[in-house]
Amino acid sequence: EGELGVLAGEEDEDTKSEFSTYTNPEELEQFLTDTGVLMLAPTIGTMHGPNKGKPGQKVKLNIKLAHELLGVANKINNDIVFVAHGASTLYPEIIQYAVQQLKYHHKSENDTKTWNDFVGTDWDQIKGLIEAGFCKINTDTENRQTYLAALLGAINKNKTKIDIRFYDKITTNALTQSYIQKLIMS
């Protein structure tokens, strides 16, 4: 799975960038020819991590560029799968629930402020990528937040439970519901 361009944000402690550069269609043909990748994650405005923009601002993906890149790739190989890295949709209700649980568990305003500042990619933007031909949408940050919100809530409501399997069922159910919702929405 190749990534062409620079994707801003923080994927992990070793993979960070303050800026993004869009994938250049003129460089794409050479990249695909040189690498032979069959899965491509172009940079079109998505970002790694939970902060995909400023609070109150919507993320705007370059759907026109996505179509152009797919056209270039299809001239070389119709079997190349397009992937969206950093495409988490961060639902306000999940964030609000997590903030409530953090307030219950910790009294730190910094924790809740950080969660309240998270900005994701709106589903209509993701749907535009799917309609353009993207086949794989990476939503790791969204999955982590769904998992953590469910886990914090379960711990806060069941303080005497020490069996990890109890919590596994709750977090697995939360993730499953999130995945089902995505399938319904696509």
Tell where the protein language model's regions lie, with residue ranges.
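Short glycine/serine/threonine-rich phosphate/pyrophosphate-binding segments
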Residues: 91-93
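A hydrophobic, small-residue-rich beta->alpha segment in the mid-to-C-terminal subdomain
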Residues: 131-161
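Catalytic cores of large soluble enzymes that bind and process phosphate-bearing ligands
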Residues: 20, 61, 118, 167, ...
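Extended, intrinsically disordered, low-complexity segments
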Residues: 150-186
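Alpha/beta enzyme core
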Residues: 1-81, 96, 100-112, 123-127, ...
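Metallocofactor- and cofactor-centric catalytic cores in central/energy metabolism, strongly enriched
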Residues: 112, 116-119, 126-127, 135-136, ...
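Short acidic/histidine-rich active-site segments
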Residues: 84-89, 121, 137-144
